[in-house]
Amino acid sequence: MSRKNFLHFPIITNGNMALSSITSSVTNIQRLDNIGIQFNWSGAPVGDFAVQISADYAQDTEGNVTNAGNWTPITLSPSPATSSGSPIYIDMFQLSAPWLRVVYTRTSGSGTLQATIVGKMI
């Protein structure tokens, strides 16, 4: 039986939700079928989360960005907002784009954000 790809690591650690926005690190999701992102926060932030994908972002073998790429938000229904309460978990299936990141956009309030991504090949 062949080895299946799997990932699990933080993409935002101690994000300051009093800032106008927080952008996660970029994650390579090639060869992964299912992706999940969990957001946990403390405090009383008000804002929205977006998942963005890119087909033209690029890194060299050392992880240096060689093309910042163009980022497109995925339509999520309903759009995840802090008003839903912490934690929020987003499950995504069969994404075709090779790169993913998340963005929190503040409306008001403040808090501290943690976000973790998981992914697996089926």
Summary of predicted features, one role per range:
Residues 1-16, 118-122:
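Short, intrinsically disordered N-terminal pre-domain segments
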Residues 4, 49, 103-121:
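Edge beta-strands of jelly-roll/beta-sandwich modules across compartments, strongly enriched
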Residues 12-30, 43-49, 57-62, 67, ...:
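Surface-exposed ligand/attachment interfaces on beta-rich extracellular proteins
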Residues 32-39, 93-112:
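Noncatalytic modules at the cell exterior or secretory-pathway interfaces
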Residues 53-59, 119-121:
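Residue-level signal for short segments within beta-strands and strand-turn junctions
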Residues 74:
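Non-catalytic beta/alpha edge segments that cap or flank active sites
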